[in-house]
């Protein structure tokens, strides 16, 4: 992994050793059916380091697993940092891999956002700063185990996040004035169907269970927005900014939901009901609205 590209920033379980099924802790909740302490393998992890219930995770009470994405950190830690070693080799190796995974994953998340920002039309000085941050972040993520374990990730993130926010603001302003600023807003369960969210800032907004049916999100910055259970049926995200696949996987949508480039329609999304004329029908909407 010598260059950062889309493939390096997407989870590839075939090149990993199931780190995300062992390293994190999770508690029994709507996202996970059981309690699991950090460092203990999930009981569903098979000897071949694949999930034994992968195709049934949602129905078996593990939707949290379906929306987790390591941004390619798992295979980098496995194949590059540890040269293909396995956490089962010995306890010191296991602990080191788990510790370093928690460092490399946020770095890879930054790499994904930086890469995404560099696809936008931005002023040359900002593009140069983003490219420099991308290279610096990749160098850090490619460090040896000792340097990674001592790395101050939060300090590095604090230097990068303002650049990403600036990129989002510049992109939102293209084609007109920026929209409403709701960054960090608590919008849990909110009915936003009649709110103009074009070119809005929804960075870090809590949109859990929000009703966004048929909402136009063109130019909206969704960096880090929590879309768990949000209703995106018929919404247009084709021109939204910084939408990660895991956000879509956590939401509800249908075939009428417009997706950004290079994103896949989650398999659990429902097909829209059809009116007699063949057009999509949306619950809660009267004809012509």
Over which residues does each language-model region extend?
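Hydrophobic scaffolds flanking metal-cofactor catalytic centers in soluble metalloenzymes
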Residues: 1-152, 156-159, 163-173
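Tandem repeat scaffolds
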Residues: 165, 173-289
């Amino acid at each position: 992994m010598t260059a950062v590209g889309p493939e390096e920033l997407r989870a590839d379980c075939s090149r990993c050793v199931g780190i995300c099924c062992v390293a994190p802790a999770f508690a029994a909740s709507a996202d996970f059916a059981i309690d699991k302490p950090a460092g203990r393998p999930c009981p569903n992890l098979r000897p071949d380091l694949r999930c034994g219930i992968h195709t049934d995770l949602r129905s078996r009470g593990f939707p949290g697993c379906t929306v987790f994405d390591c941004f390619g950190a798992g295979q980098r830690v496995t194949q590059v940092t540890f040269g293909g070693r396995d956490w089962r080799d010995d306890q010191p190796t296991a602990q080191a891999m788990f510790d370093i995974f928690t460092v490399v994953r946020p770095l890879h998340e930054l790499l994904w956002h930086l890469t995404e920002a560099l696809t936008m039309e931005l002023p040359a000085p900002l593009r140069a700063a983003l490219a420099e941050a991308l290279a610096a972040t990749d160098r850090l993520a490619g460090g040896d185990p000792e340097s990674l374990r001592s790395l101050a990730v939060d300090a590095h993130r604090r230097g990068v996040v303002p650049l990403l926010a600036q990129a989002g603001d510049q992109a939102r302003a293209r084609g007109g004035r920026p929209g409403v600023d709701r960054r960090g807003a608590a919008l849990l369960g909110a009915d936003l169907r009649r709110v103009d969210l074009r070119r809005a800032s929804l960075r870090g907004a809590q949109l859990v269970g929000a009703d966004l049916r048929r909402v136009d999100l063109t130019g909206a910055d969704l960096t880090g927005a929590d879309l768990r259970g949000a209703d995106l049926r018929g919404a247009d995200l084709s021109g939204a900014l910084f939408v990660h696949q895991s956000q879509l996987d956590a939401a509800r949508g249908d075939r009428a939901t417009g997706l950004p480039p290079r994103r896949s329609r989650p398999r659990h999304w429902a097909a829209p009901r059809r009116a007699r004329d063949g057009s999509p029908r949306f619950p809660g909407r009267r004809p012509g609205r």
